[in-house]
């Protein structure tokens, strides 16, 4: 058990038989009445975000999420196969479980698989990934107003806005949290 006064961003808790990750929190001490903690939580299984208020000093159960380093091997129909580099154990995850992460996954990529009491919860991607541009319009010389962007399709099918000087075949660094272009690789 952990006190809500000890909340930190990224902490995983179990409330009402659901696993939640603390996205944001604020300790509030009103002039009249008891102090409380206002928090923004993300359900780990469904991805939904909810605001929840706790009384100051209230106890919640801390969920111990285990992260296992694994390598993405390949897709087989709707299943996606990952391998533990230490034990060579392979697990399959369905497309629905990793729908958002699929836009960033390449074969042989190292990721962290999140598990809770033996149940696979999902994939934790690195902060940035390198992906190749497979399709984009050519930049037109002289078309240089400030911050001009164009859509580019990457090798995983992800479409991002990139500066006009980016061409097909180039490797880009993409932020996985926002799904946006960072720089050339």
UniProtKB/Swiss-Prot annotation:
<dbReference type="GO" id="GO:0005737">
    <property type="term" value="C:cytoplasm"/>
</dbReference>
<dbReference type="InterPro" id="IPR001059">
    <property type="entry name" value="Transl_elong_P/YeiP_cen"/>
</dbReference>
<dbReference type="InterPro" id="IPR015365">
    <property type="entry name" value="Elong-fact-P_C"/>
</dbReference>
<dbReference type="Pfam" id="PF08207">
    <property type="entry name" value="EFP_N"/>
</dbReference>
<comment type="similarity">
    <text>Belongs to the elongation factor P family.</text>
</comment>
<dbReference type="InterPro" id="IPR013852">
    <property type="entry name" value="Transl_elong_P/YeiP_CS"/>
</dbReference>
<comment type="function">
    <text>Involved in peptide bond synthesis. Stimulates efficient translation and peptide-bond synthesis on native or reconstituted 70S ribosomes in vitro. Probably functions indirectly by altering the affinity of the ribosome for aminoacyl-tRNA, thus increasing their reactivity as acceptors for peptidyl transferase.</text>
</comment>
<comment type="pathway">
    <text>Protein biosynthesis; polypeptide chain elongation.</text>
</comment>
<keyword id="KW-0648">Protein biosynthesis</keyword>
<dbReference type="GO" id="GO:0043043">
    <property type="term" value="P:peptide biosynthetic process"/>
</dbReference>
<dbReference type="InterPro" id="IPR008991">
    <property type="entry name" value="Translation_prot_SH3-like_sf"/>
</dbReference>
<dbReference type="InterPro" id="IPR012340">
    <property type="entry name" value="NA-bd_OB-fold"/>
</dbReference>
<dbReference type="Pfam" id="PF01132">
    <property type="entry name" value="EFP"/>
</dbReference>
<dbReference type="InterPro" id="IPR014722">
    <property type="entry name" value="Rib_uL2_dom2"/>
</dbReference>
<dbReference type="InterPro" id="IPR013185">
    <property type="entry name" value="Transl_elong_KOW-like"/>
</dbReference>
<keyword id="KW-0963">Cytoplasm</keyword>
<dbReference type="InterPro" id="IPR011768">
    <property type="entry name" value="Transl_elongation_fac_P"/>
</dbReference>
<protein>
    <recommendedName>
        <fullName>Elongation factor P</fullName>
    </recommendedName>
</protein>
<dbReference type="Pfam" id="PF09285">
    <property type="entry name" value="Elong-fact-P_C"/>
</dbReference>
<dbReference type="InterPro" id="IPR020599">
    <property type="entry name" value="Transl_elong_fac_P/YeiP"/>
</dbReference>
<dbReference type="GO" id="GO:0003746">
    <property type="term" value="F:translation elongation factor activity"/>
</dbReference>
<keyword id="KW-0251">Elongation factor</keyword>
């Amino acid at each position: 058990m952990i006190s809500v006064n000890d909340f930190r961003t990224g902490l995983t808790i179990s409330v009402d038989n659901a696993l939640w990750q603390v996205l944001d929190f604020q300790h509030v001490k009103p002039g009249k009445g008891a102090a409380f903690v206002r928090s923004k939580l993300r359900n780990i299984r469904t991805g939904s975000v909810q605001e929840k208020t706790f009384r100051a000093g209230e106890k919640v159960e801390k969920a111990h999420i285990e992260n296992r380093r694994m390598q993405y091997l390949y897709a087989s129909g709707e299943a996606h196969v990952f391998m533990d580099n230490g034990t060579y154990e392979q697990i399959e995850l369905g497309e629905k479980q990793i729908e958002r992460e699929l836009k960033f996954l390449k074969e042989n990529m190292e990721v962290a698989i999140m598990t809770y009491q033996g149940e696979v919860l999902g994939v934790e991607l690195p902060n940035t990934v390198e992906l190749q541009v497979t399709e984009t319009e050519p930049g037109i010389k002289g078309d240089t107003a400030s911050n001009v962007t164009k859509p580019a399709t990457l090798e995983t099918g992800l479409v991002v806005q990139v500066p006009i000087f980016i061409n097909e075949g180039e490797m880009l660094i993409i932020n996985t949290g926002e799904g946006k272009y960072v720089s050339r690789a």
